[in-house]
Amino acid sequence: MKMDFTTVAMARPDIVDRTFDSFSKNLRKINLRDCRLIINIDPLPEGNKRKEVVKVANKYFGEVIHNYPEKANFSAACNWVWSHADTTCIFHLEDDWVLKEPVNVRELLTFFEQHRKLQVVQLRAYRFTYNKIALSPCIMHKKLYQAMGGNLVENINPEVQMRGEKFGIIMPYPTKKLTHKGKIITYPKDKKRIILKDIGRSWIKKTEYTKQKVKKARFVTWEKK
């Protein structure tokens, strides 16, 4: 099976390697060597390590398309990767998550066949009920990612825009709110079964970087403490 993977990354080859290694080992019914990775690598914390990230990506994926922007920007990164994808569904894989157990990708794709309005299958990273999209690892249908790719406002957080919060943003997608029943499925359904681990939080605590001191809506990059 061939599928586009999209990744928004920082220049952290060790973190990226842990992420791709875990998904390569635990995703079933798909071979990453048959897939294309579309990756945006921001110049943080060290821009000169971006080539190392591409080398890591090439270990796992059959084809890698990369972008080296001059400035780090979360929304711009999403715009770039999604506007370059073209498969019916994509696997959106942020660079600092580890998959802890096997997941059958074909099983996840059958959800889109069973539910016409379905836009995203979220892999469970938290115990709460998912009624809004999160950009932790997920599978997106093209009716979602193609509507957003290239159309996100760069000074507003992409998750906020995709959730349809009221910040005066008019997106080209008429039903951008994902709170309606049938547009999000969380896998696995059992809230106690967390299959993802965030490895980015522990990394950031050990560095000189932190989140911008702004509201969630305005968070688009990291800054030095």
Predicted segment positions?
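Active-site nucleotide-sugar/metal-binding loop of Leloir-type enzymes
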Residues: N79-C89
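Short beta-strand-to-loop acidic/aromatic patch adjacent to the donor-nucleotide binding site
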Residues: T88-V98
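C-terminal catalytic/acceptor-binding lobe
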Residues: R18-T19, A147-K225
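Short, well-formed alpha-helical segments that are part of the catalytic scaffolds
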Residues: R12-L27
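Conserved nucleotide-sugar donor-binding
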Residues: D86-T87, A134-G149
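Cell-envelope/extracellular polymer assembly enzymes that use nucleotide-activated donors
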Residues: K2-D4, R36
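Conserved donor-nucleotide/metal-binding helix-loop-beta segment in metal-dependent transferases, i.e.
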Residues: E101-A125
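Acidic donor-binding segment of Leloir-type glycosyltransferases
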Residues: S24-I65
